[in-house]
Every structure is written in C-alpha cells, then in structure tokens.
Amino acid sequence: MMKKMISAVLALTAAVIGHAQHWSYNESAADWDPSDFPQTPYEVSGQVHTATVDQAREWYQAMARQFPDRCELVDMGPSDAAWPIQVFVISSESSDPIKVLVNNAIHPGEPEGVDACMLWVRDVLLVEGSSACNQVEYHIVLHYNVGGALNRNSQSRANQAGPEVYGFRGNSQNLDLNRDFIKMDSRNAESFERYFSRFQFDYFIDNHTSNGADYQYALTFFFTHADKLHPALKDHSLSLEATLRQDLFLEGWINAPYVQTRDHSPESGLVGFFETGRYATGYTALHHCIGICVETHMLKPFPQRVKATHAFLVAFSNRMATESMLREFQDLELSLRRSFSSDPWVQAGDYLPIRFELSTVPSDTLDFYGFQHGYRSSAVHGQDRLFYDRNSPQTFPVPYWNHYLAVDSARVPRAYILPRGYSREVLERIGRQRGVSVVGITKDTTMELTVSQLLSMKTSQQPYEGHYLHSQIQTVEYSRPVRLQRGDMLIKVTPENALFLVNVLEPRAPDSYFAWNFFDACLQQKEWFSDYVFEDMAAEWLETQPLVKEELQAKMKANPEWATNAGAVLTWVYQKGPWSEPSVNEIPIYRLY
C-alpha cells in the first residue's frame, strides 16, 4: 500500500512539474543592469521583453537619484504579494498643480504601459526645456498587480503578439484587480484607495491591451462615460477626448474608441463601454476624477503597442501643458468647489441615477479603419469560423451607440446609518473613501428611518471574482421606527461624496455592497418551528384572525397541490403571524431624510 501511495505522489509531482514546464521561459535576453541606465530594460532586450518588477524599481531608483529635486520613488502601500506597490512621482513647479495618476500592469499580461512610461519619463526629465510638468504633477504606478507581474510566463495571452515574457492577469489571490475597486478584496485595492484619497487626483490613466476584433488601429481609448459624471466634468471630458483624438491623428496615429462590437464584427457597429465602480475608471469617476482607459491592439507587434501608449502619454502631457488647459482647469476646479459647498450640485431629497441602459438610437457614425472579414471552415471543429483578411484593409462607416439612459435612480438621504456589526465588511471600506466620514452614535435611541425590503433578484450560479454576484435587484422602500444602539455608525451624505455613497449603499445599484454579498446574512431566516408543536399554536391563532384564515382557505382552494404540503401551509401561517422575523430580506442600510 505504501509503495502505491509513493508512486501516486511521484506521478502527481511529475504531472505538476510537467504543467509548470509548460509555462517556462528563458529571460536571459532581458538582462538589464543599472549601468545600462538611462536605457530601459525594454530597450536593452531589443524591444522583445517588458521590464520585471525588480528592473522597473531599479530603473526608477536611478532616475530619482539623478533628479532628486524633481522626482521620487514612493510606496503606494502593500499588495497581496510580498512586495509593495510603488509609484514614481514627478513634482510640479506649481503650488496647485493638476494631478494625474497613471496606472500600469493592473493586468500584467498587458504591459505596454510599464515600458512606455519609462520612455516618457526619460523624455520629460532628460530633455531640456520640457514643460510637461510645469503645471502638472504625475504619479506613475510601476506595477499595480505586483503578484501577477511576478507570475511571468509566455503562454497565458494566447491572442496577443508579444512580448516574449509577461505577467499573469490574476493577482496573488487570483483576483482580476480591475473588478475589485468597489468590493476591495485585495490589499492592492486598499492601498490604491488610500493613495487616491490622499492626493485627490484630477485625471486617471489606466493602460491596457485590448481583446476582440481585428482592425487597423494600434491605439484605441475611451474616457469614463460622460453620462454618469458630475455635470461640471461632462463637457470638459467630452471636449478633452475630442481634442486628444485630433492631436493624435495629426501626429499620424489613427485612433478609435475602445472596439466593443454590437455583433461579431465591427460592421455591426460599436457600443460604448460603460464601466461601473468595480472598474478602475468607473471607481475614479465616482470621486469626480476623469478616468481614461488606453487599449492598444493585441495583434499589433509589442514595439508598436509600446509606441502607441507612449504617443498617447505625449499627446496627453502636451495638452495638459498648454495655457488654455490651465485656464480651463482652473475654471473647472472652481466650479467643482462651488458645487460641493455654496452651490451644491446635489442635495438631500434629490435623485441620482444608479442604473443605466444603452440607448437604442446610435449617437454617431464613425469611419472605421478595419479589415475585410469572412467565414471559413474550422480545422478544429469543422464549423464556420470568423477570420479577418489583413491584406484587405477597408475604411467603412459604422454606427456608434454611445449614449446611456438612466433607468433607475435613488433618492439622496441626509445620512446613511449602518449597524456596527457591519464595521469589518462595509464600514471599513466606506470610512477610507475620499470625502467620507463615519461617526458613531453615542447612545441608544429610536428614529424613524427608511429601509429597503428585497422583492426579487438573480444570483450568479458560478463564482465571479470570489463572490456570487446579485443582479436585477428589486426592492420596496418604507419608513419605520428603528432601534439604534450606541456604536452604530452614521455616514453623512455631502455633495462631494453622494455619488459614491449612493452607488455602494443603494441595493439596486449594480455594484452596491449588497450586490457584492456584504449583506447576505439578512437573506436567511434564523428561527423556525417544529411542526408538532406549532400545529396547535397555528390553529389557535387562525381562530383569532378570520381574515387570514379566509385568505389561507382561498389559497388552498386555488392551489390544491400546495394545500397537500403540510410544511408549506404551516410555514405560510408562521410567516403571516407574530412569529415571523421582520429582519428577513430587510436590508440593514437605513436612510435619514
């Protein structure tokens, strides 16, 4: 028996080693030494490898040593791996600068931003006369997903042309960190939130590689959807996006919105990507920071994708450095400050949208630079498969659906109140947010508050990012006296934090804390009954409640099969009577109007 067990262990070990060897690689070509500075690891490799976590840190340390008065390398905070998230900060000459956060390697298999940022930083700091940072302060995240960046391989990005070696999408918990900004299951997200709140950034750039259709563009990007932005930011965001597209086009970079097709191919039209708070740019928008997601095309050679990302950074920084942008930003900043104080853009009793649906009417028509596509028989499964003919470039008009309509809204309260028992799961997440303060109630009291009762919802049958996400949530709201205990937590709603709080505390919002399972305990009944004990109690109670008894008899007559289920009938009576638990399906998020 022991020999059989040893043989089985050895066989399993061989299988595991065999699988690990499938993700093996040789990175000798990417050797980089600080003596190579100011060349980047990407350049030393012959433009075939992306910088590792160690190489990026050493390169930026060398840059910080050369320009100690202008830049520094700092820790954003811990990650889920053993290494912290690091940020390279280029200071501004202005006392009140525009603040920009650039994020790289949230998906480490999409690493263009890592290398493009090094090239851009070198341009800014080593080229005399650069005005990029005269009025702008840049914070550049080296590798946000440190754990995924350390898990390097050459196989996991099957649809991508290089680099030869790259990181993995999942972090050290196997989480997709670009779905974690509301639920904050990772230490990465906690560190991001603290850093983001501390510096109160005005713009956020998230660098990615696309998946999906084939087309001529190396560069696509989208701005966080204007339909859900603070009104003061909407026009500015739309104007800046249009200006950047034109600037890039004049520099020879044809570009398009992120290519999300309505059907299988671009000819069917494009649909604007709507990011809720789980995504990085969706999260920053909830805090009045304009987010931009850069998506270079997966099938373009890695050097071309790095150049495309670099071109976007150059276009953005050049635009930020103009006097007209400074004046526009100063006006915008003043407008925002007024909307948070003397002229509030939202007040208690107003309604904020929490759920959007795509308009059925196209908002624009785009000239799309694509390839002719067709179908042919698959050599794998024998069915028709899609293919693109890169020898047949085409430009053709496509409809663009990019307008989203609010289909649900929530009334803004003066404050939310949560039981202290939710301090670990919910209150700690809320208390760290920008512009949010949480205070404890000092004594037991009873208040008339508004609560939500769950009517229906759907729950995913498969785990999604460590949760079983709720969707299509329907509730009914009502007021009742609520007994509050000393230590329960009050969260004041202000014009600055209302957008965030409504989107996480209103249960029907798609990325609410309820949707992410933080209140699932309220969905379970805690006390029950023994049939033989409850039979007599139920009969006696029904005799005192003739209307309920009449309702029961009508229900049994209308549903004969149900009437034969004794347990179901007793449960119905139990839930109608004084024994039912009012807390079941009542979501313990209280609103004070």
Predicted regions located by residue number:
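Sec-dependent signal peptide recognition
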Residues: 2-11
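Hydrophobic h-region of N-terminal signal peptides that target proteins for export
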Residues: 11-19
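Short glycine- and acidic-rich boundary segments immediately preceding or forming the N-terminal edge
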Residues: 25-86
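Acidic/histidine-rich, surface-exposed loop or edge segments in extracytoplasmic proteins
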Residues: 28-48, 102, 176, 224, ...
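Divalent metal-coordination and catalytic microenvironments
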Residues: 52, 82, 105, 140, ...
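Active-site/substrate-binding loop(s) of hydrolase catalytic cores
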Residues: 96-106, 110-275
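Hard-cation-handling environments
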Residues: 262-453
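Catalytic centers of hydrolytic enzymes
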Residues: 420, 428-432, 439, 443, ...
